[in-house]
């Protein structure tokens, strides 16, 4: 009897190549986790990497060179052997062209094909956190060089008809309806115990949750089940609810390129205007909460409990704004603020509403809006056309993954951060070779973030997943040895 595993998701696919262009949370993003492989794997809740294409690896030359030994059995879904050339080409070309896959390759000087199944990443500087950069995100997956080399990635037909090395291959994408994948027969890696993986496109988030509760689907993506939707999954349903503290936080960031935010007093004033007692009403004890620290408390090895955002103080906020020259005009206005968030993160909308209201209380005229993933990339990431943003993202299992956003040379530094002390702390943590030493430098990083009010922490978010009672093989059940959105180990029970 054929076994289907069904995911109900509100976001359709755009394409199936997140190395070229990442569309966070889309059906294409979810599919790529199952069609392709990475060199190594990391998940949010486990700092140690697991094998994927690489069976084992070596840290050489004081973390300036990383050698990966690839699985000699690995094959592309068209039967072509997967080799070191595929790995070297994918990441070298992504970096050369500035594609999304280059986001975490900042330190890579060049990639050497040592032999057919061995590849060396030569770094321009030591980076003891390099493994988590290769393993933590979908846009680090490897593409087939024999189908991409010499082509324009933006128009390559395999973006829509992918040929991966993973356990599932695409058989049908009907936009607005579904993405259907089937298990690859005689897959070189672990053979799936399900026959088809189906992403069912259901734009209404409430209905996504309901169909899992009814047993018509088996899981939904992040931010589909939220605290206010928990009632949609009754105790006698076909689903159980998995809850967990999240791997990241929602925070308020400044457009540091604007003159008004270059004055630390103005940034500190904004932080003082934020009242977390109102934000905390969005929380769920043990799962999510308002947060005023600069790293998650779950990252105990790196967490600095002394580094905190300024407390709520409207009087201090008003005084600092005046001192920074952001005084009120004759109408009592300190100016306009455009505040954006990414609309796929459902919990960011109420945060935007709260922050907008609190900033209006100190004299700003605030407009806020949620952007789709493509619009976010265009308006915020590339265009810099914003004043403030509410942004999320993982901070676990290693703070090194945050450097792309908050270091001066970070490829995803959309807010224009340029703080020499921040850069120095990241650099020192990369050069350190023990977790204890690295943790000390990350505690210094948080101290600098707090001292200079580089950004404002708002909310440590939680995760809610309604998932089928009739399947086993979720990431948390097998030691986070696979990506959260990888379903190749699922089996019916």
Map each language-model feature to its residues.
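N-terminal lobe/hinge region of extracytoplasmic solute-binding protein
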Residues: 8-61, 92, 163-165
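Aromatic- and charge-enriched surface segment that lines or borders ligand/interaction sites
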Residues: 55-100, 114, 120, 211, ...
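Surface-exposed binding/hinge segments that line
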Residues: 69, 103-148, 172
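Detector for C-terminal structural segments
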Residues: 7-11, 30-31, 174-178, 183, ...
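Gly/Pro-rich hinge or "lid" segments in bacterial periplasmic/extracellular proteins
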Residues: 26, 30, 41-45, 136-192, ...
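A bilobed periplasmic-binding-protein/Venus flytrap-type ligand-binding module shared by bacterial periplasmic
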Residues: 71, 182-185, 244-269, 273, ...
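Structural transition elements
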Residues: 261, 290-324, 343-350
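Extracellular/periplasmic solute-recognition and catalytic clefts
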Residues: 111-113, 171-182, 198-258, 281, ...
């Amino acid at each position: 009897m054929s076994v289907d595993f069904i995911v109900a998701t509100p976001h359709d696919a755009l394409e199936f190549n997140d190395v070229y262009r990442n569309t966070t949370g889309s059906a294409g993003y979810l599919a790529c986790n199952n069609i392709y492989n990475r060199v190594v794997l990391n998940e949010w809740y486990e700092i140690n990497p697991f094998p994927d294409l690489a069976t084992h690896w070596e840290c050489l030359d004081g973390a300036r060179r990383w050698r990966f030994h690839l699985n000699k059995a690995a094959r592309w879904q068209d039967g072509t052997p997967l080799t070191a050339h595929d790995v070297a080409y994918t990441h070298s070309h992504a970096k050369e062209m500035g594609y999304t896959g280059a986001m975490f390759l900042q330190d890579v000087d060049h990639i050497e094909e040592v032999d057919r199944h061995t590849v060396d990443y030569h770094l321009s500087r030591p980076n003891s956190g390099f493994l988590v950069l290769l393993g933590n995100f979908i846009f680090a997956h490897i593409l087939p060089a024999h189908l991409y080399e010499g082509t324009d990635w933006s128009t390559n037909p395999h973006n829509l008809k992918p040929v991966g090395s993973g356990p599932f291959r695409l058989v049908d994408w009907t936009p607005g309806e579904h993405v259907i994948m089937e298990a690859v027969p005689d897959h070189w890696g672990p053979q799936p115990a399900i026959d088809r993986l189906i992403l069912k496109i259901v734009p209404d988030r409430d209905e996504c949750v309901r169909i899992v509760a009814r047993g018509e689907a088996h899981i939904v993506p992040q931010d589909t089940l939220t605290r206010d939707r928990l009632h949609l999954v009754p105790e006698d349903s076909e689903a159980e609810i998995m809850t967990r503290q999240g791997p990241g936080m929602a925070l308020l960031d400044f457009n540091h390129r604007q003159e008004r935010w270059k004055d630390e007093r103005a940034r500190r004033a904004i932080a003082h205007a934020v009242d977390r007692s109102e934000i905390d009403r969005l929380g769920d004890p043990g799962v999510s909460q308002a947060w005023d620290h600069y790293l998650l408390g779950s990252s105990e090895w790196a967490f600095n409990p002394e580094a905190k955002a300024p407390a709520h103080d409207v009087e201090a906020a008003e005084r600092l704004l005046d001192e920074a020259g952001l005084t009120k005009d004759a109408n009592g206005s300190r100016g306009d603020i455009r505040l954006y968030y990414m609309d796929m993160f459902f919990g960011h909308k109420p945060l935007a509403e709260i922050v907008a209201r609190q900033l209006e209380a100190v004299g700003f005229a605030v407009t806020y809006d949620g952007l789709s993933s493509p619009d976010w990339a265009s308006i915020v990431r590339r265009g810099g056309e914003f004043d403030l943003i509410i942004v999320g993202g993982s901070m676990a299992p290693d703070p090194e993954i945050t450097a792309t956003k908050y270091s001066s040379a970070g490829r995803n530094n959309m807010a224009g951060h340029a703080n020499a002390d921040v850069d120095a702390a990241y650099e020192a943590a990369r050069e350190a070779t023990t977790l204890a030493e690295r943790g000390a430098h990350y505690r210094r990083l948080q101290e600098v973030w707090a001292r200079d009010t580089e950004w404002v922490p708002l909310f440590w978010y939680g995760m809610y997943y309604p998932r089928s009672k009739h399947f086993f093989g979720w990431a948390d059940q097998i030691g986070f040895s696979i990506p959260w959105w990888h379903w190749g180990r699922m089996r019916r029970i």
